[in-house]
């Protein structure tokens, strides 16, 4: 039960926080399209509204009016299981304590069964790892602990990735795991002299849409607590090492191009990936085109560095979700033609350099190459702005086994033949790291097999551990 989602938390006395949260979640819709939800605290109780669907489908003006209050958390969800069950949507609520609490989570825990067993809980009855965390917190709170103490106790035992927002009576807490696998940032509503409220969100564009000022990223292991009086910070968990391990795929694919991560704008980083990828190649072609959306900045960079003209060869249907984060493989492959349509006049007879962000399973890329050939492309040369995806991610990306990963089971020549392209090349790991320009501050386990946090890994049917 793995999720890579978007989370929001807002405290703004006197403001319509439900509508603010709606706009922030809309800015994070790319991080998950299966379900959306909000929880607010008003009149001494927490109200939760959540359902399957996009943010615009789940919430209406009437719904948002019912969520009036000064404290809110929100969530957009992408998962690998339970997608048809709206009860698996977040935030998760528990009635423990005086007012109860609600929780929303981006990431994936790797020791859920151990946590459940130690607490005498059947994990199979839990809807997700987020549901399990909420249950463990409720056990502590019902035993007399404050929510802050319960968070320290429970999260110190959790392994894996979590960027989490928690709504309590008149408080919003935001916590990041000790490695900083998933992004989380803090923003201010109003000015420094006239603060109107505070916002935490997975990505900075969720702050921009509210007119909030970016303050900083929440540090690994840090807990930020927001009340009507302001913001306080504590080091809830000990950071794991002197450098955080933000997922490298946030730069490659997940994050919006206008997001800032670790001080770097994602769009600029993706253009640099394309430039360095072009420097690896000596290719004669007529047109460089990117696969929308993540591949376009890299294609622009490739064209700049190679001298081959940049152009558009694919039109994207904006009403179709992202194929990588569709919940199952059949839908991913089928959605390619619904999502993308070739510009035949730009493609016909042309030798194309097609830049995409990644190849994970290969099914969508295979369909894409076939579509371009049907449109009359003379050659289709694939250039990928990330190295081969070789290892499963246990920290929140939908790749549970190596059997699903094309590069883990085939050579590049075999991949090229399977996909049907004329040539295939990936950016080197060294060039990807150079493009991001961060010294050891990213998790690249999916590319190297070097997992920074302990996690069970199935290799040839044998469960081992990688540290």
Pin down the residues of each PLM region:
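Conserved short alpha-helical segments that host acidic/polar catalytic motifs at enzyme active sites
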Residues: 1-220, 225-285, 291, 379
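Secondary-structure transition/capping motifs at alpha-helix termini
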Residues: 143, 280-285, 304-311, 346-348, ...
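Extended, hydrophobic alpha-helical segments in both membrane/secreted and soluble proteins
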Residues: 288, 295-302, 306, 310, ...
């Amino acid at each position: 039960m793995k999720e890579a989602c978007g989370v929001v938390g807002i405290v703004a006395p006197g403001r319509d926080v439900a509508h603010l949260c709606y706009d922030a979640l809309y800015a994070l819709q790319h991080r998950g399209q299966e379900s959306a939800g909000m929880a607010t605290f008003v009149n001494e109780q927490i109200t939760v509204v959540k359902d399957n669907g996009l943010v615009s489908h789940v919430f209406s003006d009437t719904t948002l009016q019912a969520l009036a209050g000064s404290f809110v958390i929100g969530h957009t969800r992408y998962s690998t299981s339970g997608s048809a069950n709206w009860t698996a949507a977040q935030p998760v609520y528990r009635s423990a304590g005086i007012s109860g609490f609600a929780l929303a989570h981006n990431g994936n825990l790797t020791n859920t069964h151990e946590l459940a067993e130690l607490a005498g809980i059947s994990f199979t009855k839990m809807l997700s790892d987020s549901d399990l965390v909420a249950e463990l917190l409720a056990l502590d709170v019902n035993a007399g602990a404050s929510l802050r103490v319960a968070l320290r106790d429970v999260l110190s035992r959790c392994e894996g990735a979590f960027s989490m927002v928690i709504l309590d009576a008149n408080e919003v807490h935001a916590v990041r795991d000790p490695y900083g696998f998933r992004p989380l940032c803090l923003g201010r509503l109003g000015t420094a002299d006239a603060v109107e409220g505070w916002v935490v969100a997975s990505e900075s564009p969720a702050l921009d849409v509210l007119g909030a000022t970016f303050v900083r990223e929440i540090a690994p292991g840090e807990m930020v607590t927001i009340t009507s009086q302001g913001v306080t910070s504590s080091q809830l968990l000990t950071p794991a090492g002197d450098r955080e391990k933000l997922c490298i795929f946030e730069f490659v694919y997940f994050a919006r191009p206008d997001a800032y991560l670790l001080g770097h704008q994602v769009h600029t980083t993706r253009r640099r990936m394309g430039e360095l990828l072009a420097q690896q190649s000596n290719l004669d072609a007529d047109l460089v085109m990117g696969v929308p959306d993540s591949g376009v900045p890299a294609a622009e960079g490739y064209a700049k560095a190679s001298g081959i003209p940049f152009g558009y060869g694919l039109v994207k249907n904006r009403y179709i979700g992202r194929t990588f984060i569709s919940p199952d493989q059949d839908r991913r492959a089928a959605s390619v033609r619904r999502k993308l349509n070739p510009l035949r006049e730009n493609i016909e007879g042309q030798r194309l350099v097609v830049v995409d962000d990644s190849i994970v399973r290969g099914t969508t890329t295979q369909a894409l190459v076939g579509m371009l050939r049907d449109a009359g492309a003379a050659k289709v040369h694939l250039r990928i702005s990330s190295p081969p995806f070789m290892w499963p991610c246990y920290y929140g990306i939908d790749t549970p086994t190596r059997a699903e990963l094309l590069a883990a089971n085939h050579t590049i020549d075999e991949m090229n033949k399977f996909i049907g392209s004329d040539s295939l090349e990936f950016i080197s790991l060294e060039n990807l790291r150079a493009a991001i320009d961060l010294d050891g501050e990213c998790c690249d386990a999916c590319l190297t097999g070097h997992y920074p946090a302990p996690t069970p890994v199935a290799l040839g049917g044998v469960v081992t551990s990688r540290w």
